[in-house]
């Protein structure tokens, strides 16, 4: 059970920390994913999960490389602190393929954005997680909703238009809902992709307490 709790906390960091679904800008100006080589994004992150805010800056750079995963073409991005990001667009659906901290090396394909559905529309994914010592997989539900669409948002003094706001919650039948609360909000702009993310998760169950409080915002971008 403790491993499951650690996993759920890890999934929260998957949204909120530096390996979030940063990137974007569009294969065209109307999409939310930029695959053009040498495009770059500079982000600022404030991590208050431990109670004391920790600030850091990092950049994401689009490479000239792609790879095929699950019959989709994923574009590869490089982080300034090391490591890669894999993002794909299939029609109007946007995917991230990555390992999740605490998931014991398991890798997931996450549908993080649908740009052609109306505000208040929703979609969900259920991740089947294998926990050593348990004979069955444990389901973890990721619930997404288009909270707002076509809005304008100011981030670090810059105004972005036609922004999509996605709200996300995380739950599991193995953890009582009162013991796991989450409020994850991501904002995407055409021509830029992710411009802002806030991740708030509180977990208090079976003697384990975990808080995730991370804010990520776009400082600047150089799009090719």
Per-segment meaning from a language model:
Residues 1-4, 18-19:
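Positively charged n-region of N-terminal signal peptides that target proteins for export
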Residues 5-9:
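Sec-dependent signal peptide hydrophobic core
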């Amino acid at each position: 059970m403790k491993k499951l709790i650690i996993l759920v906390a890890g999934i929260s960091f998957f949204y909120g920390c530096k390996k979030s679904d940063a990137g974007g800008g569009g294969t065209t100006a109307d999409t939310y994913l930029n695959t053009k080589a040498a495009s770059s994004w500079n982000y600022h992150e404030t991590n208050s999960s431990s109670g004391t805010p920790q600030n850091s800056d990092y950049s994401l750079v689009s490479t000239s490389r792609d790879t095929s995963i699950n019959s989709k073409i994923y574009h590869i991005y490089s982080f300034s602190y090391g490591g890669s990001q894999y993002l794909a667009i299939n029609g109007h659906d946007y995917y991230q393929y990555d390992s999740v901290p605490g998931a014991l090396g398991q890798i997931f394909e996450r549908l993080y954005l649908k740009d052609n559905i109306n505000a208040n529309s929703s979609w969900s994914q259920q991740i089947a997680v294998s926990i050593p010592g348990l004979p069955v997989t444990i389901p973890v539900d990721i619930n997404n909703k288009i909270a707002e669409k076509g809005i304008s948002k100011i981030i670090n003094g810059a105004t972005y238009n036609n922004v999509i706001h996605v709200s996300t919650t995380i739950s599991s039948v193995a953890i009582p809902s009162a013991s796991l609360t989450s409020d994850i909000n991501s904002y995407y702009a055409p021509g830029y992709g992710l411009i802002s993310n806030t991740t708030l998760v509180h977990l208090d169950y079976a003697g384990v307490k975990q808080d995730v409080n991370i804010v990520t915002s776009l400082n600047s971008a150089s799009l090719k």
